[in-house]
């Protein structure tokens, strides 16, 4: 077999393991998922899983960093600091919505695992970088008297909590998340945090 075909097959098996693990971690969580289940879902042997990842923790951390970076870079690529604060907030909200819509399993996975004790130092550092960006942004908006005079963490919790709650309501079939509903929710959350 040519070297290129061998490399493609290895990449495909590794990706199959990651895809299966994402499905299972999003469905069952970290503790509810065993490596043999990942192997079965990926249609590979358990030994193949361990050829690419030394442990279940290595798999969850690989997935966490991959999807956290995708979410963050997707939002940051759209943000324009020259826009008024209100428009920046809309872009941020729409960026989260686009990621949740286009990558629902990845979004669910990130929400289940962002505080897991199994995250390694690199994954925790990435989470802290993302939090620092949001914190700095909301602190700047508070200093400009655009958002309420409360700690940035409070504003972040309100915004993030409302968004995640809305996505969970949609996933549980309690909410039909139409574009109009998404825009209305964004307006309500902005009204909750603005001065």
What are the residue ranges of the model-derived segments?
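Short linear capping/connector segments at secondary-structure termini
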Residues: 76, 110-118
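Hydrophobic/aromatic-rich alpha-helical bundle segments in the mid-to-C-terminal region
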Residues: 108, 112, 142-187
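Flexible coil/turn residues that form the inter-helical turn or adjacent wing/linker of helix-turn-helix
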Residues: 31-32, 52, 81
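Basic, helix-initiating cap at the start of DNA-binding domains
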Residues: 1-28, 32-41, 58
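Hydrophobic alpha-helical connector segments
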Residues: 62, 76-102, 155-159
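Short hydrophobic/aromatic patch on the recognition helix
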Residues: 42-53
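Amphipathic alpha-helical packing segments from all-alpha helical-bundle domains
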Residues: 69-72, 118-144, 153-157
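Alpha-helical DNA-contacting segments of helix-turn-helix folds
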Residues: 60-67
């Amino acid at each position: 077999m040519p070297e290129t075909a061998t490399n493609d097959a290895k990449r495909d098996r590794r990706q199959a393991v990651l895809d299966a693990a994402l499905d299972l971690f999003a469905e069952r969580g970290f503790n509810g998922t065993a490596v043999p289940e990942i192997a079965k879902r990926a249609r590979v042997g358990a030994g193949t899983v361990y050829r690419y990842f030394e442990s279940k923790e290595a798999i969850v951390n690989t997935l966490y960093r991959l999807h956290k970076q995708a979410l963050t870079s997707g939002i940051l690529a759209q943000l324009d600091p020259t826009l008024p604060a209100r428009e920046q907030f809309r872009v941020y909200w729409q960026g989260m919505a686009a990621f949740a819509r286009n990558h629902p399993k990845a979004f669910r996975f990130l929400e289940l695992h962002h505080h897991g004790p199994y995250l390694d130092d690199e994954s925790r550092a990435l989470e802290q970088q993302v939090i620092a960006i949001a914190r700095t942004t909301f602190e700047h908006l508070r200093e400009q008297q655009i958002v309420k005079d409360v700690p940035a963490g409070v504003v972040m919790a309100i915004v993030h909590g409302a968004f995640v709650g809305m996505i969970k309501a949609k996933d549980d079939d309690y909410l039909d998340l139409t574009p109009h509903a998404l825009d209305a929710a964004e307006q309500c959350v902005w009204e909750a945090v603005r001065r």
